[in-house]
Structure formats: structure tokens, C-alpha cells
Amino acid sequence: MAVSRITRWRLMSVIFGIKCLFLMVTLGVLLINSFTIQNIQSTPSPTTTVEFQEVSECCVCLDKWVGHQCNCYFISKEEKSWKRSRDFCASQNSSLLQPQSRNELSFMNFSQTFFWIGMHYSEKRNAWLWEDGTVPSKDLFPEFSVIRPEHCIVYSPSKSVSAESCENKNRYICKKLPI
């Protein structure tokens, strides 16, 4: 009788151990699948950005931002004053566009719209300045040297710049590094 009790307990222990092993393997498979699904869902898809985004190997931009040459651009559809445009860009952890070269905007088709960029005239320094306080390179827009206090710069469809009152309302372009 004692032998049959021991045999029963052994048999139940073996069955219980096999069930535990099966449950641990199942749990491991579920955890691996869960992490794989989370990684896929958290990776932004190139189709979540605006329709004319160029796919770049090093750009991952938020929805409604355009990726180009490892930068992200927000091209507004609404019009605001220069200051309100600057404030909007700042709220998005970006700044009004400060182009590094004339070619930087060549990938966009501007049609007939003017866009604020990050340049304004500082009466205090008697110079055109970027939003960050630096002086623009003379090579960037050599044709532009107009002195107009209380004016800011718009980028035009003809791929040139002009000065307008900062209170005028225009569309705007924000720029930031990719996520």
C-alpha cells in the first residue's frame, strides 16, 4: 500500500511538472510575440507622413511632417503672423526654417504660396538675423539686402525671398531633426 501511494504521488508530480513546463513554454512564446507586435506598432510607417514625403534612409518624421535629407519639415496649410508661426514651431520642438543652402527647398513644389522662414530684421543690431540670432550668409540670398525695420522674410514660389510686415499672415515652414 505504501508503494502504491508513492507511485501515485510520483505520477502526479511528473504530470504536474509537465503541465508547468508546458505553461512556461506557452508564456515565453506569448511574451516574444507581444514584444514583436509592440515593436512593429511603435515603428512609424512611411505612409503616416504627408503624401509628398521623400523616403530617406535616415529620416523618420512624425505624421504631417515631410522628411528630406535627414531633416523633418512641417509645411503649414494655415496662415499666421511671423511671431505666431514662430511660436507654433517652438511648440512642436522645432523652429521656423533656416535653410542651409538654396537647394534645401528644391524638393517641395510651392505653387503660388509664400511661406515664412526664420529670418527677421533687428533694428537693435541693424541687420537681418535668423531666429537664433545669427546673421545669414550673404551667399544664401545674394540678391536680398533690403533694410526694412519690423519686417520678416517670406520664401516665394519663384524660389527667392522678400520682406513683408511681420504682422502679415502667411503659411510657414518649421524644421527639426528626425525622431
From Swiss-Prot:
* Compartments where located: Cell membrane
Report domain C-type lectin positions.
68-175
Q: Which PROSITE patterns did the record assign?
A: C_TYPE_LECTIN_2
Q: Name one GO biological process term.
A: positive regulation of natural killer cell mediated cytotoxicity
| GO MF term (any one) | MHC class I protein complex binding
Residues in the Cytoplasmic compartment per record: 1-10
Q: What is its main location?
A: membrane
> Extracellular topology: which positions?
32-179
Q: Does the keyword Nucleus apply?
A: no
User: Protein name, please?
Assistant: Natural killer cells antigen CD94
Lineage top rank: taxon: Eukaryota
